[in-house]
Amino acid sequence: MLPLKRISGQLLYLPVYSNVPYQIDTVMFDMSAFVAIHNTNLSSPIYLTKVLYFNKDGKIVDDFLESGNIRVNPLATNFFYVPYEDKSGTGANFLIEWVADSLVNEPLVESVTLNVKPNNTVAVLSQGKVIRERY
């Protein structure tokens, strides 16, 4: 078994799908998205310093941390929601940055994008991709 990687921060890219093509690009299927940041540490908090939401064209739609950083306690989860009515597109994404005061386990960062309708439910699970790390 490989040893756990211990780091003090990351910048992550996380795709979400607020609209997906349905019927060969003629109709868009609207979806909502839940983004979850799970602190996998047993004793150390992490701090979310950036949670930016971009549309398919790379333009910022929302800054979820306008009021300041968020502390995520050990084994706790913080989540963000993109409503069903959002029209940011199939290529929408988040940039998420977190830091810690010491070397810690990396968090689990995921999005669940879904549309639940009778006889036509769609759900997509995505995980964050590391862009930059801090040791």
Where are these regions (language model features)?
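Hydrophobic beta-strand positions
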Residues: 37, 52-53
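Transition segment at domain starts
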Residues: 1-26, 119-135
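Asparagine-centered strand-capping/turn motif at beta-strand->loop junctions
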Residues: 37-44
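Short, hydrophobic/aromatic beta-strand segments
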Residues: 44-51, 62-64, 106-110
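Intrinsically disordered, low-complexity Pro/Gly/Ser/Thr-rich segments with frequent PxxP/GP/PP motifs
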Residues: 55-95
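Short, solvent-exposed loop/turn segments enriched in Ser/Thr/Gly
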Residues: 27-34
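Terminal connector regions
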Residues: 85-135
